[in-house]
């Protein structure tokens, strides 16, 4: 049995991962669960999966969890704090780590798993958006296997030749006959909404994604298409792709999850119902296949598959992300941090939907260029960017 640690088990990806484990109980043992502050859900997960360890970032929450597990007579050992979470990610008994903590909080535990040479199922966008070069270099050093969980990157991975799959982060696309990596996106809930109505968009409207079931933050990112911008940055790192080798297409039905175009005219696409359990199951079992508990795609129920060129006037955050990559890691790190602050401010009704990009742009334009050599540099830029973003929110 493969031993699994789930970083972010109480979040959307974490819960879907546990759902896949339930479908394949003889294949996987949940060795460790990691969360933030959600004591009730973590206690329920521990009761059901009986992991050896459970860790919460918040010390008070960890104490509350310990008490709940004692009352439930669950023997799981409770840990707390970043150091303990990083040690759990690198534990010698662990075979694979699902890296699904949202935001900068997931950086150190994910890097810890990479440095320990684990099979890392990468669902934490920020790892590559802020530390792409660091992660790729460390994976090459340690022999860690990076497998992308994001549906789009997983689709690209599946559509690439086996040689490229073995060289994530440094695959020579041109040598393998790859002409373009085609990243698809639904366009979010406001794809056809008149632009003059954007100022009145509410948080409730923004989190209602038409195709995918996701957390609030990623749903807002999908509405602004910042999500696609972050995925563009990720794809460039994961697949060693130049700007010329990247293409973004809006595909409203979310049936084709992404594609790879080859120099002989072929296009290979990965298709399926929009359910995160599919890419999760693929990464967990790779190179084999397991049951994900997902209904098969019924082609006779598909009315149409449509494709649209992205409009940067509608999605200025997408353009900002593409431009930030060209500037360097300091810019993508600053943009990512600013976006977390801006989205949180929007969800709390402190700023309007159309102000999210203004906060992000202000931060990227005002952050001083710095060479990113280590995680400490990233965390420093992240902190500065959050302070600038908070000030930008106040100034609006």
Swiss-Prot record:
Protein name, UniProt field: 1-deoxy-D-xylulose 5-phosphate reductoisomerase
NCBIfam families with a match to the protein in the record: Dxr, PRK05447.1-1, PRK12464.1
Pfam families: DXP_redisom_C, DXP_reductoisom, DXPR_C
Documented EC number(s): 1.1.1.267
Annotated pathway: Isoprenoid biosynthesis; isopentenyl diphosphate biosynthesis via DXP pathway; isopentenyl diphosphate from 1-deoxy-D-xylulose 5-phosphate: step 1/6
Domain of life of the source: Bacteria
Catalyses which reaction(s): 2-C-methyl-D-erythritol 4-phosphate + NADP(+) = 1-deoxy-D-xylulose 5-phosphate + NADPH + H(+)
Listed cofactors: Mg(2+); Mn(2+)
Gene Ontology molecular-function annotations: 1-deoxy-D-xylulose-5-phosphate reductoisomerase activity; manganese ion binding; NADPH binding
UniProt-annotated binding residues for NADPH: 10-13, 36-38, 124, 126, 215
Organism: Actinobacillus pleuropneumoniae serotype 5b (strain L20)
Family named by the database record: Belongs to the DXR family.
Binding site for 1-deoxy-D-xylulose 5-phosphate: 125, 151-152, 186, 209, 222, 227-228, 231
Keyword hit for NADP: yes
Xref: InterPro entries: DXP_reductoisomerase, DXP_reductoisomerase_C, DXP_reductoisomerase_N, DXPR_C, DXPR_C_sf, NAD(P)-bd_dom_sf
């Amino acid at each position: 049995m493969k031993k699994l640690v789930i970083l972010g088990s109480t979040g959307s990806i974490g819960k879907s991962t546990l759902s896949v484990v339930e479908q394949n109980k003889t294949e996987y043992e949940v060795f460790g669960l990691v969360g933030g502050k959600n004591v009730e859900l973590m206690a329920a997960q521990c009761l059901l999966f009986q992991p050896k360890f459970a860790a919460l970032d918040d010390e008070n929450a960890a104490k509350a969890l310990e008490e709940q597990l004692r009352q439930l007579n669950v023997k799981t050992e409770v840990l707390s704090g970043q150091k303990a979470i990083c040690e759990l990610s690198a534990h010698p008994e662990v075979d694979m780590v699902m890296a699904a903590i949202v935001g900068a909080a997931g950086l150190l535990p994910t890097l810890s798993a990479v440095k320990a040479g684990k099979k890392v199922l990468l669902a934490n966008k920020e790892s590559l958006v802020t530390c792409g070069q660091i992660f790729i270099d460390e994976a090459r050093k340690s022999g860690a296997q990076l497998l992308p969980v994001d549906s789009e990157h997983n689709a690209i991975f599946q559509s690439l030749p086996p040689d490229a799959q073995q060289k994530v982060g440094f695959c020579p696309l041109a040598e393998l006959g790859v002409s373009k990596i085609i990243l698809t996106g639904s366009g979010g809930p406001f794809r056809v909404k008149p632009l003059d109505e954007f100022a009145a968009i509410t948080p409730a409207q923004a989190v209602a994604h038409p195709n995918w079931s996701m957390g609030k933050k990623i749903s807002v990112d999908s509405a602004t298409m910042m999500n696609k911008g972050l995925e563009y940055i990720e794809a460039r790192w994961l697949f060693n792709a130049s700007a010329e080798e990247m293409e973004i297409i809006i595909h409203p039905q979310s049936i084709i999850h992404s594609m790879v175009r080859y120099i002989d005219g072929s296009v290979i696409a990965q298709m399926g119902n929009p359910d995160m359990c599919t890419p999760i199951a693929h990464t967990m079992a790779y190179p084999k296949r397991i049951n994900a508990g997902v209904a098969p795609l019924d082609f006779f129920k598909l009315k149409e598959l449509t494709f649209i060129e992205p409009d940067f006037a509608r999605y200025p955050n997408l353009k900002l992300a593409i431009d930030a990559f060209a500037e360097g890691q300091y810019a993508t790190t600053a943009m990512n941090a600013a976006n977390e602050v801006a989205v949180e401010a929007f969800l709390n009704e402190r700023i309007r939907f159309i102000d999210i990009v203004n906060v992000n742009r202000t931060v990227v334009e005002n952050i001083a260029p710095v060479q990113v050599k280590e995680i400490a540099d990233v965390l420093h830029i992240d902190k500065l960017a959050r302070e600038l973003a908070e000030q930008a929110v106040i100034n609006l």
